[in-house]
Amino acid sequence: MKIDGTRSNDRATEVVLDYYAAFNRGDWEAMLVLLDEGVVHDLNQGARETGKAAFARFLARMEASYREQLHDIVVMTSPDGNRAAAEYVVHGTYLASDPGLPEARGQSYVLPGGAFFEIHDGRIHRVTNYYNLEDWIAQVR
């Protein structure tokens, strides 16, 4: 979906929607293009990772263990376009066991989630993801 792009918050909305469209296609390169070199990635209930290379490794880990699609994406932005938030519903399949988590057996799950973004000059500088890990674990046990 294209927005007129004349206002900062419209451009920020477009960046976030492009990011999630690339995610849903499994197009990791298109996701990486939208990130600043020093992107900060706050993993849900986990560590903070910094840099595009770290984000690429995260995507490789995700691809190995999960197949996910995000539905019902809603994006909200600040008037200056420097911050954005997204809410969505994750529809996924747990393909291969992720260390420290229950054993994967091809379980399906549906889980609400959200993210916060910092965006400058059309690039994502920070993405912080949230979902209810206990809910996810209960669904895949």
Show the residue positions of the predicted features:
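C-terminal and inter-domain tail/linker signature
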Residues: 1-141
